[in-house]
């Protein structure tokens, strides 16, 4: 019997060539998008809310294809609405997807109404106002792909979009908003589907990147032989 001793290395200890081999070996057996189920769930909810059917779509780390979008239960006049008429139609029918009710309490002090919060609202004659705010709460399925998919709707109707990094809504630049004014209802719905697959493609691209692989190696304590052969990774 022979006893063989093998030195194991962490990813950061490998040579550049060994790192490339490790990354390529991992990619060769990990083809599925980790968040593919979430993408499909968001797409299903988009189809339900908009009354559409999306078929023959695809995406990977290199690109995406929205496939064929069938507008079930729509008529040509609705799809052709443009400008302010399109904005009004989308707001009335789908605005609830991106804007949430928000309550403001006001009290009357010395004959004037002023904003109040908390217990103060109980001290004086009060009235309540409601408005709507884009809070980025992922209203379709609870994952970030919802916000990406609905951003075109929020942009067209309200001139806002959700900044995932800042975790807040931001105003869309005026030049971008004006370009949107020429779009039709059909354009906006198609943009929502396109935005979903664009986000999925970018997420898939990051998943396959060397940066993400290095993070996974560190988080999971993966080890390698000197030439980059993976020893204990899933």
Model-derived regions, located:
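Alpha-helical propensity feature that highlights long, continuous alpha-helices across diverse contexts
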Residues: 1-234
